[in-house]
Amino acid sequence: MSELNDLLTTRELQRWRLILGEAAETTLCGLDDNARQIDHALEWLYGRDPERLQRGERSGGLGGSNLTTPEWINSIHTLFPQQVIERLESDAVLRYGIEDVVTNLDVLERMQPSESLLRAVLHTKHLMNPEVLAAARRIVCQVVEEIMARLAKEVRQAFSGVRDRRRRSFIPLARNFDFKSTLRANLQHWHPQHGKLYIESPRFNSRIKRQSEQWQLVLLVDQSGSMVDSVIHSAVMAACLWQLPGIRTHLVAFDTSVVDLTADVADPVELLMKVQLGGGTNIASAVEYGRQLIEQPAKSVIILVSDFYEGGSSSLLTHQVKKCVQSGIKVLGLAALDSTATPCYDRDTAQALVNVGAQIAAMTPGELASWLAENLQS
């Protein structure tokens, strides 16, 4: 082992010691003050892992267990980069159920607003007293504003129109740049000696405005705890679509009951604070409710955001979706609507819905905006 110590720097040895744990300290090396603080912070959180306890490993090594939650929050904000902080805070709430991370006012105000923290707040807001809830609302507002700014741009771009390569535009927008026409128009500016083509007259395409008048859009959102990312993005997406002319947007949340949140769709913060995560699911009743909202089936879309694990009757769900499709309603089932579009869903139920005419996919919000722009044609 002395040969290994000769090959590795002290910092590298300390990194291996942090990875391997306290048992490796005598073999590798001790920790300096900074590394020991890192070890304390990591041990405070991950020392409570059930698998470690089953193996007989003690938790909270080297004094880490003596940290209070506020002290732990302060320490990780000093010791780690932002990406690691968000992961640690998320694991504390969602993996280990350390609820005072988001129910303690001092701790909550110290935490960095992020989507991970937003998820944690939505899972635990029912435990918060009014003062903590007010602080949580400010966090929700900040994170939602950041998501809204990003998604609103994607929605506007999707509905701005398709490029018309036959018509020239004199408005210089990068996304409308016509590469081939620009080459043809500037061939006379080719310099053989320099081996370069100088662009003096760039060309741009115009766009054909998409028509989306008099469409009705119903978003049915599963409130299962596993769907929290999709709930967040559905709320923000609905607010973005609400601002578009010619689209009437409804947002309905469901578990075993159905709650129409359309009155709050323009305010995604208020909407998210009303969502109740967890519980069972009765998807069929949500689809039936959505179908009853429709006024002109041929000008309507129902988007069902769910993992398709039906707590009620799967055959009744299939029947309700079939009735929607047969009436002329476009039905899109989304197993995930978030930034990664990584689904986990009941494939048998999803296939049954495909068999009666629904489309099933997992999409990012930008992909959903593009899908809607293509399908909402008058």
Curated annotation (Swiss-Prot):
<dbReference type="GO" id="GO:0071978">
    <property type="term" value="P:bacterial-type flagellum-dependent swarming motility"/>
</dbReference>
<dbReference type="InterPro" id="IPR008912">
    <property type="entry name" value="Uncharacterised_CoxE"/>
</dbReference>
<protein>
    <recommendedName>
        <fullName>Uncharacterized protein YehP</fullName>
    </recommendedName>
</protein>
<dbReference type="InterPro" id="IPR002035">
    <property type="entry name" value="VWF_A"/>
</dbReference>
<dbReference type="InterPro" id="IPR050458">
    <property type="entry name" value="LolB"/>
</dbReference>
<dbReference type="InterPro" id="IPR036465">
    <property type="entry name" value="vWFA_dom_sf"/>
</dbReference>
<dbReference type="Pfam" id="PF05762">
    <property type="entry name" value="VWA_CoxE"/>
</dbReference>
